[in-house]
Amino acid sequence: MTVIDAKGLILGRLASSVAKQLLSGDEKVYIINAEKAIISGSRAATLREYRETRDRGATEFGPYFPKRPDRILKRTIRGMLPYKRARGRDAMSRLKVYVGVPYELKGAETTTIADADMRLLSSNKYVELGEVSQKMGSKF
């Protein structure tokens, strides 16, 4: 069981690292504090891109894109897995993503991913996933 704290981690780098970990092993991966993961880039451009992604298509026919930060993070990881095949579905079943810290993981030892740390950014342009989620209308 691996518990990863997403606070201050870059979304894409976190997602690719977790996807590799899920495909290579049999252990469960829990991600806590999903709303505190960051997306690098201009705040206005990032919010616009996520809004356009959410508004694409029709409400009856899809594509359906999540609003909540835990679901956005899980969808990002899903995009890096072969989720239509058995090994991808199996990998997704071992992943749990939470907003905040759930009761059962309060005392658990957390790890972080050094390659995904926000201190690696060359600029200070970023936005938290929770803020993106709130701008899309989420009430997490």
Swiss-Prot record:
Alphabetical keyword list: Ribonucleoprotein, Ribosomal protein
Coiled coil: none
Record has Ribosomal protein as a keyword: yes
Keyword Transcription: no
A single MF term (Gene Ontology): structural constituent of ribosome
One BP term from GO: negative regulation of translation
GO cellular component: cytosolic large ribosomal subunit
CDD domains with a match to the protein in the record: Ribosomal_L13
PANTHER family, sorted: LARGE RIBOSOMAL SUBUNIT PROTEIN UL13, RIBOSOMAL PROTEIN L13
The protein's assembly and partners: Part of the 50S ribosomal subunit.
Protein role: This protein is one of the early assembly proteins of the 50S ribosomal subunit, although it is not seen to bind rRNA by itself. It is important during the early stages of 50S assembly.
UniProt similarity note: Belongs to the universal ribosomal protein uL13 family.
Annotated NCBIfam families: L13_A_E, PRK06394.1
Protein name stated in the entry: Large ribosomal subunit protein uL13
Native organism: Methanosarcina mazei (strain ATCC BAA-159 / DSM 3647 / Goe1 / Go1 / JCM 11833 / OCM 88)
